[in-house]
Amino acid sequence: LKRMWFSNGIYHHYGCEKFVPDFSSDYLRMVIDHTDKSLIPLKDNETMDRFCDEIFPVMFEASVLPKRVNKADKQDLVTTSACNYYENVTQAEVEKFYNDMKDEADESMPSYGLNSKLVKRDGSIVECKWTENGMYGPAISHIIYWLEKARNEAENEQQKKVISILTEYYRTGDLRTFDRFSIEWLKETEGRVDFINGFIEVYGDPLGLKASWEGFVSYKDIEATRRAQTISDNAQWFEDNSPIDPRFKKKEVKGVIANVVCAAMLGGDEYPSSAIGINLPNADWIRARYGSKSVTIGNLTEAYDQAAMGNGFNEEFVIDASM
């Protein structure tokens, strides 16, 4: 149960390998048979036998959907991955669908596919957008509700503007609105409180297109940020003197913001296994024009350091610590 909680499911949170239960399928069926049937998430007209026939192989057979994200060569990465971003489509179909959307002449092209599930229905491929009135609508409505509450408590007008654009994005699903949000988010540097909220990282998609949701609220560590800012203020010097080919050096380094923050709240894919640093946004064209925010999460870094130190139990009480 702890492994499932920590990994948000039956796949390792980092390696993506499936782990199977230590109890048997017969035991689980016995437990289900003694459970109030109204608590079992059956589909319309689905029988208990059909329900078990569908989920038991995925849970108990190591060879069935063995990886959440498969990156192996010469395999269809979509059909062999257990992620829930695609349904009844192949890797080739996904790639063609999104390649057809792209306009290489568009220098501010959005991250197509970031906030949707791709599904083939009746022979046609459609995007199911994650919006207030689309897929996951009830959950997204709650996100909008609390964002609007937060807007009333914002520290400055720029924060209010950022939150307003984000709620617009959740309502429409328009990825260009999300890019506009990201740009305005970069401009907000005066407040002590900052946040991340949205479909951000694409590690859970074998094709690197679709993002998982995460939420993160933080506040600045003033003294540690002062030290970090000294480095970022001299970013051009580091760029000019870096030991790389001059062809790859930027003549003008833009928008480097380095803060040390304390995490106040973690949610979604950011929890319970959290990063200790964040550098956003991910869109290359936004980073090139407007820069990025680079954040070290001080209290989590300290927690990892403390955990790595151990508690001295082995050294004190075990003759051979390697045992």
Sequence positions of predicted segments:
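Contiguous, non-catalytic segments that form substrate-binding/exosite surfaces or channel walls
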Residues: 4-322
